[in-house]
């Protein structure tokens, strides 16, 4: 070989194959890194053995190091902590929505009597308006739906929210339509359900509907049109998890407000002490009071607990066994529901102590707590009937009330001054 000739060494096939495979692995890893850059997971684990509602909660994943959100009662304002720009908070807004499910216009977030321009009067209390005031969670496009994972490991319960289906344990049950398709938006009522003579409404300045049984409530909700119904356990459970993760506590009333948990009067002419809807229309996205005479507001929704019990679909007790159905269609008998693995004997009541987290949400499985320990909320049950879930408590239940307050002691036929329902909407399928 002459001096200066170029010598090229070619690797053997095994070396080339290994190099090719390694290069592909590196490129795949880079692609995966790019893919997950926009993914968020806000998680919390709850120590079953710690009765303190705050110290039992530990942040996980992207929530680690974040300042929790809570009412600043002395200053009279809600402090978002580090949660104001989190996707499920910033993509939530108040809007007027037509009976056909069309979003008509957004409302001023700090004064719902105005449209979003802050000047034009809205229809938030107009009973002649052909629709309802709704709290919208927009997961369309790249905004991200609210995916939820719940499970237990040892003495810990886990609840994790993500803007993607991070793995197969994450569900979007709250978005599932009755036909089985999946929506991109959620529509919750801004106000407790009132009655206009034909249908349940979500409007300000109205008397709450009460003294109705489950069948009547469902019929009046559906009278709004296709896609309207009363609340469901999957929607209730999802929003409760959002509140707990934001506030890093199991005591919803301490973090967000007591709600109207007193004021009952035995007088129908005074609506038994129920506050009218819309008392917090000028209080923003979240607001509450330390006293028991005012409403509480979370995610633009008044009355998430207190004032009047709300009946919901999807959670029953049949012969002492708790059954759940996380997606529609629903019924009041338990057909096609699933066992959640929790059974109570006889009938009883007490402050919640133990809870079980699973694919069916977080559900009480024992009593023995108090108003300041564990979930801080109360539970009633009756193993001798088919009971339909009531949630939140009323204006006669005091400290028993809260996000987790649950009654499985009432049949579908029960009607009384303290019980009613509110309306929710499934996003229409785009034409």
For every predicted segment, state its role.
Residues 1-33:
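Short, low-complexity N-terminal tether/leader segments at secretion or assembly junctions of large
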Residues 34-136, 142:
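GGW-centered surface loops in extracellular recognition modules
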């Amino acid at each position: 070989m002459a001096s200066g000739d170029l010598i090229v060494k070619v690797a053997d096939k095994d070396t080339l194959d290994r190099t090719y495979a390694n290069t592909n692995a590196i490129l795949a890893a880079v692609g995966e890194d790019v893919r997950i850059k926009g993914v968020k997971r806000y998680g919390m684990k709850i120590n079953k053995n710690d009765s303190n509602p705050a110290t039992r909660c530990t942040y996980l994943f992207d929530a680690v190091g974040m300042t929790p959100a809570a009412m600043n009662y002395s200053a009279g304002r809600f402090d978002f902590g580090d949660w104001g720009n989190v996707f499920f908070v910033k993509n939530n807004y108040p809007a007027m929505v037509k009976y056909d499910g069309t979003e008509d216009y957004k409302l001023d977030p700090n004064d719902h009597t105005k449209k979003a321009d802050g000047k034009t009067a809205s229809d938030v209390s107009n009973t002649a308006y052909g629709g309802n005031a709704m709290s919208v969670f927009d997961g369309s496009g790249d905004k991200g739906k609210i995916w939820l994972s719940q499970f237990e490991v040892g003495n810990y319960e886990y609840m994790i929210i993500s803007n993607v289906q991070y793995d197969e344990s994450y569900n979007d049950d709250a978005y599932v339509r009755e036909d089985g398709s999946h929506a991109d938006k959620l529509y919750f009522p801004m106000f407790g359900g009132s009655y206009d003579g034909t249908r349940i409404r979500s409007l300000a300045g109205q008397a709450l509907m009460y003294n109705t049984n489950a069948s009547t409530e469902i019929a009046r909700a559906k009278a709004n049109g296709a896609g309207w119904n009363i609340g469901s356990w999957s929607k209730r459970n999802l929003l409760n998890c959002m509140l707990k993760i934001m506030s890093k506590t199991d005591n919803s009333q301490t973090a967000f407000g007591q709600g109207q948990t007193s004021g009952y009067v035995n007088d129908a002419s005074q609506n038994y002490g129920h506050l009218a809807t819309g008392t917090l229309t000028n209080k923003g996205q979240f607001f509450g009071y330390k006293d028991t005479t005012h409403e509480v507001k979370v995610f633009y929704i008044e009355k998430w607990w207190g004032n009047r019990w709300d009946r919901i679909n999807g959670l029953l007790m049949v012969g002492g066994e708790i059954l759940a159905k996380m997606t529609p269609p629903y019924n009041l008998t338990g057909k096609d529901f699933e066992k959640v693995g929790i059974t109570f004997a006889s009938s009883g009541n007490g402050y919640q102590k133990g809870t079980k987290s699973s694919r069916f949400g977080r559900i009480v499985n024992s009593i023995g707590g108090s108003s300041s320990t564990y979930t801080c909320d109360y539970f009633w049950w009756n193993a001798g009937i088919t009971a339909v879930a009531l949630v939140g408590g009323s204006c006669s239940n005091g400290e028993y009330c809260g996000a987790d307050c649950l009654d499985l002691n009432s049949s579908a036929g029960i009607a009384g001054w303290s019980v009613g329902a509110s309306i929710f909407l499934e996003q229409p399928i785009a034409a």
